[in-house]
């Protein structure tokens, strides 16, 4: 596998993917230094912070036995392996820490970045064990099954026929705002699996993929269990602990945080607003807005309902219209914490209250909104863990790599390397196209046209004083003529590039296909395409190969991997 690194700051072609905050966070800049100092508790580049955080975790009293019992039962329910169980058992020791990541349930695991998050947690746990052999580090994947965005959870995307194909699964029965993970797969899931498999070409690996999906996705099984079982099958050789946070026993472990939110609301929201102001003063937009109560209420139908606070001592469940005093809602939370679900703000705090979280593996969006939560963590007496960027990949298939070779020749720049061609594609693919159609001389042509236009404009301007002196009305005629000449030059310029485009039309079409592969729907590949597209072609061992790549590289740059 050939591997190339690209700085996040240079990636501009995809419409979405890497925010300014994330680019600064992963850079070597003064902006990063200030961002870490003002918005986070720890810097993963500072050795002293590692020992400080290990000491903080060692001082806390985690309910490890109850946590192990919960994870053991879930491991059995998710068809986990003995190797995973051995990882779970390590958590009994106060010298075992967790490397945590997570994602909501996705159909057939969802976008590629779900796999990349899990892989990064696995690899980082190994690396930390090498650095601190007296401790154990286990990778934990938080399944965000309480999220009620069913449209996102029930669909996935594959390449198909030179385009993209979205596959969507139907629910057996679903109410508005119902937790996506708890929703059962409908009777048509078998047909959905077959539709997905039909989009995959026949390979030596396809029968194994079919067996995995057909056994994990069955009518009546919840989206969460199907997702978890599929993840366990893919990570058999790389033990990953899966955690379902919708479990009643997990909520009992988190009861102190849940109750404190009810007891002190809207205090944590004020903290988020204050931290967001700091962030905005640094030039970064706030990613999320807090509610008065950063909890949802789960009714008997599994619907995730908002909790509003119309007055300091009164709470309202919307849209059920149930009203509670603070004391009443607090009693419900103490007796039945399973009726409450943290929102995007409280979720990481609940996570780090229950788990001995050494580090959290986050994507660009997550790191951006975690920057708003420092003061909220302090409100609950917690320190933020290390926040480490997940591995970010673009997988380049052989056909696309060959196109890159042709593009390299077409640019007319013999000094260009393959890495520089990828940089050009990721930085500005339109500029690269322009370079190709002019045989590598686009900059010279641009300069020549600009020179001609400038000289004509300057020549005409020398006429202006004499013409105005003769007849002031001639100034308008001169101005109009200047505009027409500029327009004519622009037309000639466009025709020049069109002539070049015809000359290189075939290669440009290949570049269009490469762009679709690298940036499907204008987004980074990892944000849309499903992992099984690649596992079907290159085998399940691809996950191990990507783990090896991560083992040797930092996650502070984007990785381009030629398969």
Swiss-Prot record:
Keywords: Coiled coil, Ligase. It comes from the Bacteria. The keyword tRNA processing does not apply. It is an enzyme of class 6 (ligase). GO terms for molecular function: ligase activity. Residues 493-518 form a coiled coil. Its EC number is 6.-.-.-. Belongs to the BshC family. This is Putative cysteine ligase BshC.
């Amino acid at each position: 596998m050939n591997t190339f690194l690209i700085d996040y700051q240079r990636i501009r072609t995809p419409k979405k993917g890497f925010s300014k905050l994330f680019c600064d966070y992963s850079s070597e800049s003064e902006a990063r230094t200030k961002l870490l100092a003002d918005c986070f508790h720890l810097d993963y580049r500072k050795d002293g912070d590692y020992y400080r955080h290990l000491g903080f975790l060692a001082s806390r009293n985690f309910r490890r036995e109850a946590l192990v019992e919960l994870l053991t039962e879930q491991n059995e329910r998710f068809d986990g392996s003995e190797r995973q169980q051995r990882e779970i058992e390590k958590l009994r020791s106060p010298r075992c820490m967790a490397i945590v990541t997570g994602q909501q349930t996705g159909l057939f695991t969802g976008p590629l970045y779900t796999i990349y998050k899990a892989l990064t947690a696995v690899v980082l746990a190994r690396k930390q064990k090498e650095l601190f052999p007296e401790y154990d580090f286990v990778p934990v994947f938080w399944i965000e099954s309480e999220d009620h965005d069913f449209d996102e959870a029930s669909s996935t995307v594959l390449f198909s026929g030179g385009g993209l194909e979205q596959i969507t699964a139907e629910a057996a029965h679903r109410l508005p705002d119902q937790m996506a993970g708890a929703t059962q797969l409908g009777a048509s899931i078998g047909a959905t699996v077959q539709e997905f498999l039909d989009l995959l070409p026949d390979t030596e690996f396809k029968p194994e993929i079919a067996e995995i999906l057909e056994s994990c996705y069955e009518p009546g099984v919840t989206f969460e269990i199907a997702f978890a079982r599929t993840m366990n099958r893919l990570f058999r050789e790389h033990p990953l602990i899966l955690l379902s946070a919708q479990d009643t026993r997990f909520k009992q472990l988190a009861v102190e945080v849940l109750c404190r939110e009810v007891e002190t609301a809207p205090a944590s929201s004020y903290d988020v607003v204050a931290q967001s102001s700091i962030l905005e003063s640094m030039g970064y937009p706030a990613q999320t807005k807090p509610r008065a109560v950063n909890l949802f209420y789960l009714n008997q139908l599994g619907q995730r309902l908002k909790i509003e606070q119309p007055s300091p001592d009164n709470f309202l469940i919307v849209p059920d219209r149930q009203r509670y005093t603070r004391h009443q809602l607090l009693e419900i939370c103490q007796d039945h914490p399973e009726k409450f679900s943290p929102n995007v703000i409280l979720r990481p705090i609940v996570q780090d209250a229950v788990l001995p979280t050494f580090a959290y593996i986050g994507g660009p969006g997550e790191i951006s909104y975690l920057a708003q939560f420092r003061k909220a963590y302090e409100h609950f007496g917690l320190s933020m863990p290390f926040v480490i960027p997940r591995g970010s990949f673009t997988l380049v298939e052989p056909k696309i790599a060959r196109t890159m070779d042709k593009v390299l020749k077409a640019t007319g720049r013999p000094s260009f390397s393959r890495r520089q061609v990828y940089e050009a594609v990721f930085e500005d693919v339109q500029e690269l196209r322009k370079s190709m159609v002019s045989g590598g001389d686009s900059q010279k042509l641009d300069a020549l046209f600009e020179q001609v236009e400038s000289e004509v404009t300057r020549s005409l301007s020398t006429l202006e004083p004499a013409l105005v002196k003769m007849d002031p009305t001639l100034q308008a005629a001169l101005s109009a003529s200047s505009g027409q000449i500029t327009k004519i030059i622009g037309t000639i310029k466009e025709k020049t590039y069109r002539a070049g485009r015809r000359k290189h039309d075939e290669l440009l079409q290949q570049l269009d296909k490469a762009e679709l592969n690298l940036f499907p729907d204008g987004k980074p590949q990892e944000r849309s395409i499903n992992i099984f597209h690649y596992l079907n072609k290159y085998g399940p061992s691809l996950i191990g190969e990507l783990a090896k790549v991560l083992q040797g590289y930092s996650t502070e740059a984007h990785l381009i991997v030629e398969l």
